[in-house]
């Protein structure tokens, strides 16, 4: 299974829209956006719609711990993660799980030919891996029943 499979399932179930925010928006607006969409990260798009960064709940918590309530007035661009780990649609789910676990991050933008095409979370990856294991288990049970 690859990332493309996860993106296709997300598109079927959720519409597949990518939630983004401008780097000039303040952290309070970003927190409201995350809450409204019930998501844990938002991508930041710069000039030409290119990926500039990602802002996660962890980034917001870090800013709040460093600056207190004043952090809510900081711009997203000041707080976002700039060196974003990305993947392609053809990468395997196993590879993505390894990278996310090793890097200790939960969201990964999917980039194809320099264009942002989606965002996957560790929850998406785990859900699809569980479905894959359940399918394999059911196939094995069917095989045993007919043997």
Task: List the predicted regions and their residue ranges.
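Tandem CBS (Cystathionine beta-synthase) repeat/Bateman regulatory domains
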Residues: 1-147
């Amino acid at each position: 299974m690859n990332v493309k499979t996860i993106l296709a399932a997300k598109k079927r179930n959720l519409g597949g829209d990518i939630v983004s925010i401008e780097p000039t928006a303040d952290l309070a607006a970003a927190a409201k956006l995350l809450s409204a969409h019930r998501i844990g990260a938002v991508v930041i798009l710069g000039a030409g719609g290119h990926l500039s960064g990602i802002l996660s709940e962890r980034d917001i918590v870090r800013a709040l711990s460093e600056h207190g309530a004043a952090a809510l007035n900081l711009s997203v661009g000041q707080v976002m993660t700039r060196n974003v780990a990305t993947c392609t649609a053809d990468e395997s789910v196993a590879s993505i799980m390894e990278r996310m676990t090793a890097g200790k991050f939960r969201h990964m933008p999917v980039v194809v030919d320099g264009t942002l095409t989606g965002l996957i979370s560790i929850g998406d990856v785990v859900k699809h891996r569980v479905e894959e294991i359940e399918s394999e288990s059911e196939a094995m049970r069917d095989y045993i029943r007919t043997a």
